[in-house]
């Protein structure tokens, strides 16, 4: 699909311009970005990627109704189409979909259509899930080598997740679905088509072999998900938030939802800064975490300081068996002076190109010490209302997550 934009100035200097929009090119880029940005949290027994010819049963209504985005103005996008997971799996053709189970879902969806809500941005956070009892799960397992369970949530402006079923927590039907499928199948893959992180305690309860956050990947999100599931794309996304064991572990929970004011009791210790400083034991998946289908070896070749400029050179080698990309993250531990500091804070990160097995790339990571100055609002350092870089040792750590 191509569109042409033309323009002409009617007065003064007349100049005609012509620009062609290559929608196919943009769609391919969107698909690649959505696939690479998926975050693989768990992959026991090398369950992913799926192998050619594997028989797979797909559960969860969101396999048909893919969340391309959230609600509100950010979701009011006139996409020409939205790909979903089930049709993309069949289009791809690498695995064999359990079409009998697919038909059960399609018949159920006729009587349980998607709830769009009543008004702008009023779409509910989750959709009613089809009940999956033990008998259906066992029957599907007898016809398949693996199961995919797709769980969906929307998101949107003027709203946040709450500690309620269908929002941050799973619903009773989703719990039943996971319990029965994980019990019946030797290999279960859980795909999270969500706009925010959700409660993850079910991972320990039901022990699925693989867990993949695909977020909300736009109109090409379904195909992007399948690219990751089948290994066409190696996931290289990293968590941009900490996933705690329990929602009560987040310091913001205590003061969440006040319509009048937000009181940040955590002060400067927001997000991973709080957990790494005060509550490491409350973390289930750390900030910056994300697995790959291959393995990488990272080595710091050099580190230099010139004035306020800090430069590190990292050598990344793909020591695994498939191609992939890795992100090197540089963290700073600042001295604990008169102004409070988090134990670690992200300084800079860089991502490799796609490396084949055995290939190496050097990454240059640059940052400025001035960026880590703290604001002294009370004058405790003798420099009131100034940004102060306190004296002491500034220690940098390189890794692939905050740990």
Report each predicted region and the residues it spans:
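C-terminal non-catalytic regions of proteins with extracellular/luminal or membrane-system context
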Residues: 1-403
